[in-house]
């Protein structure tokens, strides 16, 4: 009886551990806007990666001139893998059912440049979008912003 009770407790703990691991891994599969994994989402690297990828560029054309010195991912294969994660899961920023360079790509780029309110949205939200206000779009984009590492603010 005692052995059976211990085994069932062990079984429950194992299930809890596996459930937590599966949940944790599924969260990691979404990706974030820090495409090159340098610890921050930057308009001139990550934003341009997303824009170029949205236009259909791949390989060297995708990464040419955009790899920064602090990038963890430095090859087209690495960058494309990271882009595919965020593109498939969250690339449709305005919620119109499509990932489009001239809407979603420009929204992300503008956001990463620090634009907000009407300057973020004017002229780039699709007519059939479900997220149309600046606050909706800013909220959606901000959910995938990476946390800034401590060294990011070192002077």
Range-by-range predicted roles:
Residues 2-12:
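Bacterial N-terminal signal peptides that target proteins for export
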Residues 11-21:
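Bacterial N-terminal signal peptides
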Residues 23-155:
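Cellulosome-associated attachment modules in secreted, modular CAZymes
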């Amino acid at each position: 009886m005692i052995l059976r009770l211990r085994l069932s407790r062990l079984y429950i703990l194992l299930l809890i551990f596996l459930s937590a691991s599966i949940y944790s891994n599924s969260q990691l599969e979404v990706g974030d806007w820090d495409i090159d994994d340098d610890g921050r989402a930057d308009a001139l690297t990550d934003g341009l990666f997303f824009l170029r990828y949205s236009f259909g560029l791949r390989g060297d054309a995708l990464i040419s001139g955009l790899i920064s010195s602090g990038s963890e991912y430095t090859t087209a294969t690495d960058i494309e893998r990271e882009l595919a994660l965020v593109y498939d899961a969250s690339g449709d920023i305005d919620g119109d059912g499509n990932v489009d360079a001239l809407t979603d790509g420009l929204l992300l780029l503008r956001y990463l440049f620090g634009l907000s309110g009407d300057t973020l949205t004017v002229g780039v939200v699709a007519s059939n979008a479900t997220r149309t206000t600046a606050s909706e779009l800013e909220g959606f984009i901000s959910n995938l912003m990476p946390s800034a590492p401590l060294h990011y603010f070192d002077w």
